[in-house]
């Protein structure tokens, strides 16, 4: 496998996982306030 492909897949996975986590954190902060 190409290193570039692995990096792209890794970045896409991080973005996919980080997106919902950020939304949840913001929602919890608003809920706490």
Curated annotation (Swiss-Prot):
Transmembrane segments: 5-25
Cellular compartments annotated: Plastid, Chloroplast thylakoid membrane
One Pfam family matching this protein: PSII_Ycf12
Membrane topology: Single-pass membrane protein
GO cellular component: chloroplast thylakoid membrane; photosystem II
S-S bonds: none
Protein's GO biological process: photosynthesis
Keywords: Chloroplast, Membrane, Photosynthesis, Photosystem II, Plastid, Thylakoid, Transmembrane, Transmembrane helix
Family the UniProt entry places it in: Belongs to the Psb30/Ycf12 family.
NCBIfam families: PRK13686.1 (NF010239)
Subunit structure: PSII is composed of 1 copy each of membrane proteins PsbA, PsbB, PsbC, PsbD, PsbE, PsbF, PsbH, PsbI, PsbJ, PsbK, PsbL, PsbM, PsbT, PsbY, PsbZ, Psb30/Ycf12, peripheral proteins of the oxygen-evolving complex and a large number of cofactors. It forms dimeric complexes.
Function description: A core subunit of photosystem II (PSII), probably helps stabilize the reaction center.
HAMAP family: PSII_Psb30_Ycf12
Protein name according to UniProt: Photosystem II reaction center protein Psb30
Organism: Euglena deses
């Amino acid at each position: 496998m190409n290193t570039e492909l692995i990096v792209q897949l890794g970045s896409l996975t991080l973005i996919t996982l980080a997106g919902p986590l950020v939304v949840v954190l913001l929602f919890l902060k608003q809920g706490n306030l």
